[in-house]
């Protein structure tokens, strides 16, 4: 078995991202085939507990403590204040799920997963998963059972309202609970840095757009760009290309930028359903925006951008383009949650063509760039 494991590790280390994804998938299928029916049921039962143990480890500082050094059970009891008999069971459970590792009879230490769970953004990410995503997922069965027509057509009539006992839409509710915005941004910050700017020939697209030395044009308008991470990636990719880079966001999000605004990036308060003040920019960039809404709302926002585009402008949509079958689990989960929480959706290639056509746009090219079907879609007005 050790020789087999070493061979798999060697293959995993020496292949590209697509190859690693296939290895991971094939191994998951193989391992699942070994489970008995009862083991499959037990794993379902363990799912909620696994998340709860992660939350406990974050809240009680267990992962941080072990990431600094190994601890004995008495040391962790003193550090956390949790009752000895309960903490010992929690630690054993965390070790059984691979969150930490056991050392000797009563000792515990960090592993790779512990280090991740002790990371700077993980606390907010885990809290967001536990406080927001978990209740939404739990409310889906009841939502479907109670409705004769379970179609979700409005942001005010989704699983979110049932999960949080509110009549407000998801983002309206979040505005009244700003701590969750901060947790959301920490969650999103953990995504792998597969850079959209490396996915297509971006300098060829810019061409001679910025050649006029007397005019500083706008290179990028990052619509709904959060705290500017993608604009920073754009600047790093093209430090030698002059031109303004502007992030547009709602006020509730800009609060989280504050004095930490990245150098060379402008921030502007903006609602994407109001007239676009930046006209004739080279790129109007939307990342994880269209999947928040159903088609009608997307068309409305896209038409606003079209009115601001010049003859050299390009619309860039950075989102998943999912296949009609064999969808990766990551994209499938995200699609379900977007629909359940916000009446949004991840879209197939056909759905993207139909959506952009309805808005008055045509797709010039699509560049996939990761295993979750994340893609750069380049479009222009018809």
Swiss-Prot record:
Signal peptide: none
Keywords assigned by UniProt, alphabetized: Methyltransferase, S-adenosyl-L-methionine, Transferase
Recorded phenotype for the gene knockout or disruption: Abolishes the production of okaramine B and leads to the accumulation of 3-desmethyl okaramine B.
Keyword set includes Methyltransferase: yes
InterPro entries: COMT-like, O_MeTrfase_dom, SAM-dependent_MTases_sf, WH-like_DNA-bd_sf, WH_DNA-bd_sf
GO BP, one annotated term: secondary metabolite biosynthetic process
Stated name of the protein: O-methyltransferase okaF
Species: Penicillium ochrochloron
